[in-house]
Swiss-Prot record:
It catalyses: N-terminal N-formyl-L-methionyl-[peptide] + H2O = N-terminal L-methionyl-[peptide] + formate. It comes from Chlamydia muridarum (strain MoPn / Nigg). This is Peptide deformylase. Belongs to the polypeptide deformylase family. HAMAP family: Pep_deformylase (MF_00163). The gene is def. GO terms for molecular function: metal ion binding; peptide deformylase activity. GO terms for biological process: co-translational protein modification; translation. The active site is at residue 142. Its cofactor is Fe(2+). Binds 1 Fe(2+) ion. Removes the formyl group from the N-terminal Met of newly synthesized proteins. Requires at least a dipeptide for an efficient rate of reaction. N-terminal L-methionine is a prerequisite for activity but the enzyme has broad specificity at other positions. The keyword Iron applies.
Amino acid sequence: MIRDLEYYDSPILRKVAAPIDEITDELRQLVLDMSETMTFYKGVGLAAPQVGHSVALFIMGVEKELDDGELIFCDFPKVFINPVITQKSEQLVYGNEGCLSIPGLRGEVARPDKITVTAKNLDGQPFSMTLEGFLARIVMHETDHLHGVLYIDRMSDKDKTKQFKNNLEKIRRKYSILRGL
């Protein structure tokens, strides 16, 4: 089932997500729904708070990035439960980011080029991955969602132009009206 997205200015996007203690049938269904939702909206990652669930879970739909920048998508997304970024490279790389919860806007964000993340999969088994480049960026972006942080919070002030701020305000107003606020 395709879930409704939470958009910029939704309070759930600013909450710290609760850890997941148990893998339940409801959690498995949430992951299936998130996968359908991410595919429908053409995302590369999706965090549970973006579909209204403040739990420490995200999915990533990209398996690898080729040398020419082409993305290879997974048949079924990688599931990260209670993810923790345990290592980050000191080298920062700027990259252009967008977010399904902030439609139509993109911004330059500096992030470590290489990370190691530990998490549990949908079977409750712990795993660790070292990622670099775009895949590392996806994991950091989605992990930020679980801490109530949006990519716009990581943009430098000089990149938040007046036009960018005006567009952000338009998004806030549009989706506040749709939520009935």
